[in-house]
């Protein structure tokens, strides 16, 4: 029986009966009779009257209920589970479930167990413990009690600070005392997070051995460093042996408040995580919970369909693979002997971080250090201090008078430069201390008037002094280089550190205060103390893959985190094959929305299944638990999907919103102020995790593979070849109705984390990123973010530093360029930015030969130059250091930019330049690695390592050319890029001429490849011919090589960059097989629905087959009729109708959002919560009939909406007419017997709407919905000739295609400034010249129209003539040459009208302003559009409008149209 005390107190029976529990009456422990309100008042009345009150002792029946131990434990448990304070979520008030007499039991236990303290101390402790933190009841009883005398109240406690303890309580670094089976005696006092008191733990109490202390989990090796006692010792107790993690979780709330009185700074003992035996290999497979449908619940039938067949929790786990806990003494550095026998600190650096504003001149290096005593690696942080700014002053030849702006005749010496810096510059910029010396440096970049080799004054001073202006000039010096070079760059370059590697720190210093969350912290007082250790393999890393589920709060529309799951591998090797399985431990934590409750049996279900699930009462508790686990596990790499642009941002925002302490545990650097979140580059989110690298598999997949979208479901299907079920966001709330549903939700999150980890392993993301980083010499965390431009930049930086060159300073671009400074990938994502950049870098690209369109059924040879542009750079020694660029004066004198000045090729006798040398190194190293791969009996791990290395070398070498032509690159050199492409065009034309001289027909060529029609059906002869051409071409070059890329058995060549072919693949037995290859066709683009793609694939397969023409036409006809019927009767799955289109910018940044279907749907998705789509993401949508008369573009819906809304149905006519018909019609153009009318008839469409004609829309217009009337302005005028006008001041050609440049806050009028950054003259100052140029362009277009050239629609004919033929067909004049097809105008009336509309559009400022938001409109009007500027715009617009008024194209004369009908009436 449980012990029951006979207290000398009187309890009212009614109080017991009302509450059903003694707990209801124990808020105040007053020894007063409570037999009834009336009797109490009567006694009070008598007492006031002066009557003597006699105490009567009555024989009372026992008010205690006698129960056995098991019943009492259940009662205590039930009270703990009860949320007895409404909406309190257990924070601040905690019900521990015990009776009022349990405190006395605990007092006795404390008296008997306490050691080293006298009784007084215990009594004092007991007094503190017995103060329950409860609120005063608002009733008459409270008034009576208050009247008896003033009670001493508890000191007010700041709950936000108390919640800080909740985070620490979750930190599993702290050992707990041994606990025994129930009854659980817990001190009754205020808790920080009462939610964790609920025993929704993964294990049941019977799993804990009763009465026996748990064996400590330690490695077999003895610990050489003494283990300091834990914080529990401060409370006067001996540290207990370590408990397994399972037991720690059960006892997670068993700490005293005193355990946390010690400062965090003194916590120097950390351990590696011990994984609980969540998957017990000795346990039989857990039986799944069966789910029965409840017809009364609307969502049950839907949820039932997604219940898992196999539970992911039933996986066995090998205990031997799980790392054991280790303890380290951070004050005792693991030093080893260096090369010169001195004690050094050796570590493998992984990530680096600098804070130039708060800690200038300091670089933090994060990595792993080997602990010999326990044979493992743990995290460390090395703080490198005193990295000085390094500037180079270029002296003038003659002194310069800054006042007059003229050069004097006084020669300049280096002493003069020094004195000017010492007396003027240092005083002005408060540089109190500096060092200087004379050095000789080389320069080879784009600033004119800088000599190739010269003496410079090198000046070094503390980085704590602000940097000097980038454009600083003086009387004795003309340029200053290195003003804005970062401390991190200086450190990496000067110490020759190329990517993650082993480093040694001489004379390492301990830090007084902890600066990081790492196990060891070291300080290097100067960068020279850090040196590279070569040729040592990397250590294994701790990798954590996590996934989380969010819900949108319906009130504030913020994303709230409800569950998280993580998988961890504690020894993930970077130089071997991925481990199998790719994780060793896992954990899962779940909370609930504020308006939901957990299922009543949820705790029992997870206990029964023996799962490791932590239940958190609030989101704050959940996040605190996650941060504590991250701190405990200490991962080196966090892996996720869409983690950079959504999950990490949401996590940090919720940390901020919930005021969770120690937010910086998400990274490794201790910080108090969270960086600014929400920037488009994700800069703040990346900085928050410094020290822990972020691997976003979405970013990695975009670089390594091609998919129609990069959503997790698509990646799982493409890479892992399995299906991922998606839980709609709106169904998550309903999953809290039953344990089985909630369990499935957690399993879904767990599986997502596993999918993410598997994708990372399948793509070899980490080993590849490491190899690329070691080649380029940048930072691995940036490589994982996909910055190709930055990789090239660092590779060249290392090369030029090593060769004593001054490198270009980083340019701070104004407006959109600032955003591109960190993220070069946006070149692909934002077309507007890309176009703006290219205005300053316009040069001719690769040559594309005109295709001889048609179907070829003889063998076609495809010859391809290997790595054309890198090979050209090597072949002709094209480099910054070898090519003499034309002077700026010559460039300004060039009026026609299209006839750009191509620099001369360098002298063949010149020494090889740095750029070709670096490319050659990469090529040669790749060849060596490929040779090593051919060795016999290689270890599979070594083969994989070699393969990853050669792939990294190839990726790096092929991207080297890009830095020359990318206008935001630090090494941007337009003349060099133009020279490379010029030589590429020249080589392709020369190769074409050579092949034609061999009496062979070249039918197509594109940049680095040509197609040759062999007119042969003998494969052996074809290869002989190919080898002959190959040898003839290769004779001309030393390094350039052309090779046979493919042989096509048949080829359907439609237009430039568009063809389909059957590729021949020889087999070992002398025969061959064929494989279909598609290039540029609609069916390989993602903005066509799968139904159209599948139909197009079938048609192509038929055309390329060996069947007769009649059979092909018949098969196509049958298939199209079948498809038309299936679409109309609704037997086609909805997924076949989904159209995918990529966002080129964030959805909210589009000015005309309604007319763009993917933008409209993206905004809806973002409003729903669960995920966030942004620039670069792909949006799926379907076109539906919704009962409205809106255009197709405005009837686009997300697939989820189609499933939910009953009034939506697939728009079958749209898909047949606008998706399937155009795709099939384009493919069948060269095929006799099939035309657009027949295709329409077969699909069940109205054939009168179609006529035989050539589709001349560009590939971008192909994907648009509903025709020209529904196009946006950008898409409507995409093919128009851009308006160009030379700047009278600088001669730069300005290109205008819109009223505004830039977007968002960076928007400004296109006429506001010249595209030449150095030109200060605005185009608004020469409006007369601009108007005259516009009139001349319009007249030229009109003349072109009236020239009246006609061309034949037949692709194989293409005749061009001006004389109108006499023979006409129903569709127009017949071509007199081929007599098959009709003639069409080369420059149609529609083209002329569209061009005139475009000229009006680019100067219609009033219309453009109306499309903006009110805020943007007011800002632009105030800043850029005074009345005078608006009038200038209107004048130019009126010119185009005047010419348009003369055109009759847009007008319909109704009187003429209905003249016949009017006469009849």
Curated annotation (Swiss-Prot):
The uppermost taxa in this organism's lineage are: Eukaryota, Metazoa, Chordata, Craniata, Vertebrata
**Chain residues that bind Zn(2+) 2:** 1352, 1357, 1375, 1378
Per the record, where are the segments of Basic residues compositional bias? 26-35
**Which species expresses this protein natively?**
Mus musculus (Mouse)
Question: Which PANTHER family does the UniProt record give?
Answer: DNA POLYMERASE ALPHA CATALYTIC SUBUNIT (PTHR45861:SF1)
The catalytic activity, as recorded, is: DNA(n) + a 2'-deoxyribonucleoside 5'-triphosphate = DNA(n+1) + diphosphate
According to its UniProt record, this protein's enzyme class is: transferase
Protein location: Nucleus; Cytoplasm, Cytosol
Keyword terms of this UniProt record: Acetylation, Cytoplasm, DNA replication, DNA-binding, DNA-directed DNA polymerase, Metal-binding, Nucleotidyltransferase, Nucleus, Phosphoprotein, Transferase, Zinc, Zinc-finger
Q: Which residues carry this modification: N6-succinyllysine?
A: 974
Query: Where in this protein does the record say Phosphothreonine is found?
Result: 180
Entry annotated with the keyword Disulfide bond: no
Give the note: In eukaryotes there are five DNA polymerases: alpha, beta, gamma, delta, and epsilon which are responsible for different reactions of DNA synthesis.
Residue ranges covered by zinc fingers (CysA-type): 1287-1317
Name-wise, this protein is DNA polymerase alpha catalytic subunit
Task: Relate the outcome reported for changing residue 1180 to F.
Answer: In temperature-sensitive FT20 cell line; defective activity
Give a brief account of the tissues where this protein occurs: Expressed in those zones containing proliferating cells in the developing embryonic neocortex, as well as in the lateral and medial ganglionic eminences. After birth, expressed in cells that remain proliferating in the ventricular and subventricular zone of the striatum.
MF-aspect GO terms: chromatin binding; DNA binding; DNA-directed DNA polymerase activity; nucleotide binding; zinc ion binding
From start to end residue, where is composition biased (Basic and acidic residues)? 265-274, 285-297
In residue numbers, the region (Disordered) covers: 20-39, 105-135, 261-297
Task: Give its E.C. classification number.
Answer: 2.7.7.7
Q: What does this protein do?
A: Catalytic subunit of the DNA polymerase alpha complex (also known as the alpha DNA polymerase-primase complex) which plays an essential role in the initiation of DNA synthesis. During the S phase of the cell cycle, the DNA polymerase alpha complex (composed of a catalytic subunit POLA1, a regulatory subunit POLA2 and two primase subunits PRIM1 and PRIM2) is recruited to DNA at the replicative forks via direct interactions with MCM10 and WDHD1. The primase subunit of the polymerase alpha complex initiates DNA synthesis by oligomerising short RNA primers on both leading and lagging strands.
Positions contributing to Zn(2+) 1 binding: 1287, 1290, 1314, 1319
Q: Where is this region: DNA-binding?
A: 654-719, 1249-1380
């Amino acid at each position: 029986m449980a012990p029951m005390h006979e207290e000398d107190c009187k309890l009212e029976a009614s109080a017991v009966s009302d509450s059903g529990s003694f707990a209801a009456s124990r808020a105040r422990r007053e020894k007063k009779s409570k037999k009834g309100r009336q009797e109490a008042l009567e006694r009070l009345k008598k007492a006031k009257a002066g009557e003597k009150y006699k105490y009567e002792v009555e024989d009372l029946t026992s008010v205690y209920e006698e129960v056995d131990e098991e019943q009492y434990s259940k009662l205590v448990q039930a009270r703990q589970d009860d949320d007895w304070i409404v909406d309190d979520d257990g924070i601040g008030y905690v019900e521990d479930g015990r009776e009022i007499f349990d405190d006395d039991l605990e007092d006795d236990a404390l008296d008997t167990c306490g050691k080293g303290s006298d009784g007084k101390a215990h009594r004092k402790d007991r007094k503190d413990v017995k103060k329950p933190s409860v609120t005063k009841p608002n009733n008459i009883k409270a008034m009576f009690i208050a009247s008896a005398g003033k009670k001493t109240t508890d000191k007010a406690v700041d709950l936000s600070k108390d919640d800080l303890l909740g985070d620490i309580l979750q930190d599993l670094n702290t050992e707990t005392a041994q606990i025994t089976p129930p009854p659980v005696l817990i001190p009754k006092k205020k808790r920080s997070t009462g939610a964790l008191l609920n025993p929704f733990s993964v294990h049941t109490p019977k799993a804990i051995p009763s009465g026996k202390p748990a064996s400590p989990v330690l490695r077999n090796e003895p610990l050489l460093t003494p283990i300091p006692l834990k914080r529990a010792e401060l409370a006067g107790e001996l540290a207990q042996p370590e408990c397994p993690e399972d037991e720690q979780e059960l006892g997670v709330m068993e700490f005293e408040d005193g355990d946390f009185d010690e400062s965090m700074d003194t916590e120097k003992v950390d351990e590696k995580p011990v994984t609980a035996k969540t998957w017990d290999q000795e346990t039989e497979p857990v039986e799944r919970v069966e789910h029965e449908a409840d017809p009364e619940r609307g969502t049950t039938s839907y949820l039932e369909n997604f219940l898992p067949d196999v539970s992911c929790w039933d996986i066995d786990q090998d205990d031997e693979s799980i790392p054991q806990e280790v303890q380290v003494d951070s004050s005792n550095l693991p030093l080893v002997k260096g090369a010169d026998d001195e004690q050094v600190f050796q570590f493998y650096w992984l990530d680096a971080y600098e804070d130039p504003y708060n800690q200038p001149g300091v670089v933090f290096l994060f990595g792993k250090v080997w602990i010999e005593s326990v044979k493992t690696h743990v995290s460390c942080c090395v703080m490198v201090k005193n990295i000085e700014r390094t500037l180079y002053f270029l002296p003038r030849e003659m002194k310069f008078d800054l006042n007059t702006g003229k050069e004097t005749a006084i020669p300049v010496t280096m002493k003069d430069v020094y004195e000017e810096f010492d007396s003027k510059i240092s005083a002005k910029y408060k540089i109190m201390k500096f060092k200087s010396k004379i050095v000789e440096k080389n320069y080879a970049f784009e600033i004119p008037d800088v000599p190739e080799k010269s003496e410079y004054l090198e000046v070094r001073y503390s980085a704590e002094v602000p940097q000097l202006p980038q454009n600083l000039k003086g009387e004795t010096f003309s340029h200053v280089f290195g003003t804005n070079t970062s401390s991190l760059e200086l450190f990496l370059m000067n110490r020759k550190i190329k990517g993650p590697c082993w480093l040694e720190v001489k004379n390492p210093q301990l830090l007084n205060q902890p600066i990081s969350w790492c196990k060891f912290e070291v300080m290097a007082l100067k960068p020279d103390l850090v040196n590279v250790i070569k040729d040592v393999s990397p250590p294994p890393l701790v990798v954590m893959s996590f996934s989380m589920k969010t819900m949108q709060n319906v009130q504030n529309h913020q994303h709230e985190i409800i569950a998280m799951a993580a998988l961890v591998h504690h020894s993930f090797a970077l130089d071997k094959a991925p481990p199998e399985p790719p994780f060793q431990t896992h954990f899962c934590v779940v909370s609930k929305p504020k308006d939901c409750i957990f299922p009543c049996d949820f705790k029992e279900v997870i206990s029964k299944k023996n799962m490791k699930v932590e239940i958190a009462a609030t989101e704050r508790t959940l996040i605190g638990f996650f941060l504590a686990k991250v701190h405990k596990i200490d991962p080196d790499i966090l892996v996720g999907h869409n983690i950079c642009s959504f999950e990490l941002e949401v996590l940090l925002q919720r940390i901020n919103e919930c005021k969770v302490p120690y937010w910086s545990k998400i990274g490794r650097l201790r910080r108090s102020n969270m960086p600014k979140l929400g920037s488009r580059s994700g800069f703040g989110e990346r900085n928050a995790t410094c020290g822990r690298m972020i691997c976003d598999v979405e970013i990695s997949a975009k670089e390594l593979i091609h998919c129609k979208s990069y959503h997790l479901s698509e990646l799982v299907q493409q890479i892992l070849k399995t299906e991922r079920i998606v839980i709609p966001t709106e169904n998550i709330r309903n999953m809290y109705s039953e344990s089985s549903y909630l369990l499935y939700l957690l399993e879904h999150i767990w599986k997502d984390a596993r999918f993410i980890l598997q994708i990372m392993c399948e793509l070899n993301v980490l080993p590849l990123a490491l190899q690329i980083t070691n080649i380029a010499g940048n930072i691995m965390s940036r490589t994982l973010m996909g910055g190709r431009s930055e990789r090239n930049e660092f590779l060249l930086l290392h090369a030029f530093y090593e060769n004593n060159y001054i490198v270009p300073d980083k340019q701070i671009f104004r407006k959109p360029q600032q955003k591109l400074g960190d993220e070069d990938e946006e070149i692909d994502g934002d077309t507007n930015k890309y176009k703006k950049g290219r205005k300053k870098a316009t040069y001719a690209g690769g040559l594309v030969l005109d295709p001889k369109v048609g179907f070829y059924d003889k063998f076609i040879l495809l010859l391809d130059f290997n790595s054309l542009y890198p090979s050209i750079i090597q072949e002709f020694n094209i480099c910054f250091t070898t090519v003499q660029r034309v002077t700026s004066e010559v460039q300004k004198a060039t009026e026609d930019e299209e006839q750009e000045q191509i620099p001369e090729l360098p002298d063949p006798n010149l020494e090889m330049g740095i750029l070709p040398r670096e490319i050659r190194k990469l090529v040669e190293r790749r060849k060596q690695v490929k040779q090593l791969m051919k060795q016999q009996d290689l270890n599979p791990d070594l083969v994989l390592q070699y393969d990853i290395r050669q792939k990294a070398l190839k990726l790096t070498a092929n991207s080297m050319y890009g830095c020359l032509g990318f206008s935001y690159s630090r090494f941007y050199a337009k003349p060099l890029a133009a020279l490379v492409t010029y030589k590429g065009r020249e080589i392709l034309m020369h190769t074409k001429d050579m092949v034609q001289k061999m009496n062979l027909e070249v039918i197509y060529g594109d940049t680095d490849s040509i197609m040759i029609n062999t007119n042969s059906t003998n494969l052996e002869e074809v290869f002989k011919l190919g080898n002959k051409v190959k040898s003839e071409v290769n004779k001309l070059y030393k390094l350039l090589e052309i090779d046979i890329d493919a042989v096509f058995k048949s080829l359907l060549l439609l237009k430039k960059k568009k063809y389909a072919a059957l590729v021949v693949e020889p087999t070992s037995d002398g025969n061959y097989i064929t494989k279909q290859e598609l290039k540029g066709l609609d069916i390989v683009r993602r903005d066509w629905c799968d139904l159209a793609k599948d139909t197009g694939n079938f048609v192509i397969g038929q055309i390329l087959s060996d069947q007769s023409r009649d059979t092909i036409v018949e098969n196509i006809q049958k298939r199209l009729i079948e498809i038309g019927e299936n679409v109309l009767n609704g037997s086609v799955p909805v997924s076949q109708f989904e159209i995918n289109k990529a966002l080129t910018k964030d959805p909210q940044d589009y000015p005309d959002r309604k007319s763009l279907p993917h933008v409209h749907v993206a905004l809806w998705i973002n409003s729903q919560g669960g995920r966030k789509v942004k620039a670069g993401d792909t949006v799926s949508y379907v076109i539906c009939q919704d009962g409205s008369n809106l255009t197709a573009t405005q009837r686009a819906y997300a697939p989820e909406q189609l499933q939910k809304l009953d009034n939506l149905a697939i728009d079958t006519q749209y898909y047949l007419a606008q998706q399937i018909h155009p795709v099939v019609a384009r493919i069948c153009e060269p095929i006799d017997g099939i035309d657009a009318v027949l295709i329409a008839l077969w699909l069940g469409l109205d054939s009168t709407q179609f006529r035989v004609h050539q589709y001349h829309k560009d590939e971008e217009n192909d994907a648009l919905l509903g025709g020209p009337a529904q196009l946006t302005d950008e898409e409507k005028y995409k093919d128009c000739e851009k308006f160009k006008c030379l700047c009278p001041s600088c001669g730069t050609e300005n290109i205008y295609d819109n009223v505004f440049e830039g977007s968002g806050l960076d928007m400004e009028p296109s006429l506001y400034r010249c595209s030449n950054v150095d030109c200060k003259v605005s185009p608004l100052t020469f409006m007369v010249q601009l108007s005259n140029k516009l009139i001349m362009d319009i007249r030229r277009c009109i003349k072109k129209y009236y020239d009246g050239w006609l061309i034949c629609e037949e692709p194989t004919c293409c005749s061009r003539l001006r004389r109108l033929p006499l023979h006409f067909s129903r569709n127009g004049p017949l071509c007199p040459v081929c007599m098959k097809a009709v003639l069409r105008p080369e420059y149609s009336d529609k083209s002329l009208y569209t061009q005139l509309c475009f000229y009006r559009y680019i100067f219609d400022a009033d219309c453009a302003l109306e499309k903006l938001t009110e805020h943007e409109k007011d800002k632009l009007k105030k800043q850029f559009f005074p009345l005078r500027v608006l009038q200038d715009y209107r004048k130019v617009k009126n010119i185009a409008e005047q010419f348009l008024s003369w055109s009759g194209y847009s007008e319909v004369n109704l009187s003429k149209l209905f003249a016949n009908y009017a006469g009849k009436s």
